[in-house]
A protein has these predicted regions:
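Charged phosphotransfer/docking patches of two-component systems
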Residues: 11-15, 87
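Extreme N-terminal starter segment of soluble prokaryotic enzymes
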Residues: 1-4
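Charged, amphipathic alpha-helical segments characteristic of ABC-type P-loop ATPases involved
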Residues: 23-24, 50
Length: 126
């Protein structure tokens, strides 16, 4: 995991996630930080080269599941949210993990380890 997209409308949360990611993976590249459904739909309408998307569920302009109704995202997604009631819905849209805010570096590390295991298994199957 080197190339990351963050969808988060709270600046402090986005900065915190970026800092945690660089602590765990110093060579991580934040491809884009998006703050809204509208920005996200526009961004993912193009060809996106990223390894994982970190996505908050509650954005200022609605819930992020609306993004999936407009564009296909074929990149693994790790949801980062304060709401646990969306977990089942999250796993219907390419989610590999669901981190409840506030989460710790160890939680993020476990999610990234899971991403690495899943992508390694996928590469071996090809």
């Amino acid at each position: 995991m080197k190339r990351v997209v963050i969808i988060e409308d709270e600046t402090a949360a986005a900065v915190n996630l970026r800092n945690m990611l660089t602590t765990i993976t110093p060579d991580v590249e934040i491809v884009e930080v998006l703050e809204s459904i509208e920005e996200s739909v526009e961004f993912f309408s193009r060809d996106v080269d990223a390894d994982v998307v970190f996505m908050d569920i509650h954005l200022a302009d609605g819930d992020s599941f609306r993004i999936f109704k407009s564009v296909d995202i074929n990149i693994p997604i790790i949801f980062t949210t304060a709401y646990d009631e969306y977990a089942l819905e999250a796993f219907k849209v390419n989610s590999i993990d669901y981190l409840l805010k506030p989460f710790k570096v160890e939680d993020l590390r476990r999610a990234l380890d899971k991403l690495h295991r899943l992508t390694a298994t996928e590469r071996m199957a090809q």
